[in-house]
Amino acid sequence: MKKNLILLLFFLIASHSMYAQCWQSISAGYYHTIAIKSDGTLWAWGGNFAGQIGDDSTINKSLPVQIGMDNDWVKLAAGDYHNLAIKSNGTLWSWGSNYYGQLGDGTNINRLIPIQIGNSSNWSTIIAGDHHSLAINSNGQLWAWGRNNSGQLGNGNTINGNIPYQVGNDSNWQSIGAGYAHSIALKSNGTLWAWGSNFAGQLGNGNSTDSLLPIQIGLSSDWQSIDAEDYHSLAIKSNGTLWAWGWNNPAFFVNNGVDYLYIPTQIGTDNDWKSIKTGQYHAIALKLNNTLWSWGSGSYGQLAHGTNTHTYPPTQINNLANWQTITCGDLFTLAVNTDGNLWTSGNNISGQLGDGTTTDKTNLTQVNCTSLGLNNVQYKSISVFPNPTNDYINISNGINIEKIIITNVLGKIVFETTQHLSKVNVESFQSGIYILNIYINDKKYNIKFIKE
């Protein structure tokens, strides 16, 4: 009995360590999601036609997959089909679509794994627009690259750039946001700036004329945080009030019957907003009490209210007050709570919610921390499903499998075969976390799965 209790305690501790404080930061693109775990490892899932998952394939993933073995990732940003990330040493990396040079590597070639951009090691802040990229270094200088059809690079022309170009000579840039073809930024003095496309008023300067250079929005110097998507922008002031401008049809952001908001317009009267993120047609926000709110289009369940209806004004999601980090994809929502658990809702056509399905969700659904990730060298043709499972795990495209060994978290072998199986019966396994070890060409590949 004592031995069994010790083993049970060890299992509980091991299981807890796999779940505790799992997800640290998240970002979402058009149909994919990227995330950093608390151990500094990089993960991704969802649509992958341009290699935006970063696992050296173009196969969609409906469960989180680890990208490489590095554990020193600290910041990330997802665009429509490309990503940016910063390591703890200040180096900048990118991968995915590169049609417009948005990866910044001097080419227009898609990259299926993260590659380093230049040799600088002083990058501090990044954001990815639909097809362009922005970054601030530790000196407060702003850089831009990628598509520039409307002047969203802010360098005075409309020529695409496939390497980072400095935006002006100022060195007091603090934070940045990027939409389809416009950019916004905050300076350290609290002033707000914008440039690029302006047909819907997304620059917030009172007209619809594009700007090839950064222009100041109003005279206020009390802006605190910003975000942008497609043809609109949102921001929070230092007094906790929430503002929006740009495309507003059909009153997704400000319910005033106006399609285009040419200047920042306040959303409601609340003054306790903490952070804001926006998708294509919806927005989510945190309040100072760590409650989570959403509004706008709910066509795919992205508002997480249990329906597909539109909502205005901002409405609280559940009654919890433990939310910490938020982000939006185009039509889906992600949020991390103070326990480090990740929850998602909305459109799931490419598996971007990370729950192992491609079914839309109208309520928040948890993403397992111990997911179907290859945690050493990745073998891109293998997929394992369902995960979690009650009875069988299926191994698809497992070409030339020489041996299969399944171990529990204590390392004990519970199943072993040299047969080339496409399905393994795990119905008799106790509930818990297991490691599927697949041997191919004298190499071993590990995949975690959960038996419920």
Placement of each model-derived feature along the sequence:
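Hydrophobic loop/turn residues within beta-sheet-rich immunoglobulin-like superfamily modules
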Residues: 36, 86, 120, 136, ...
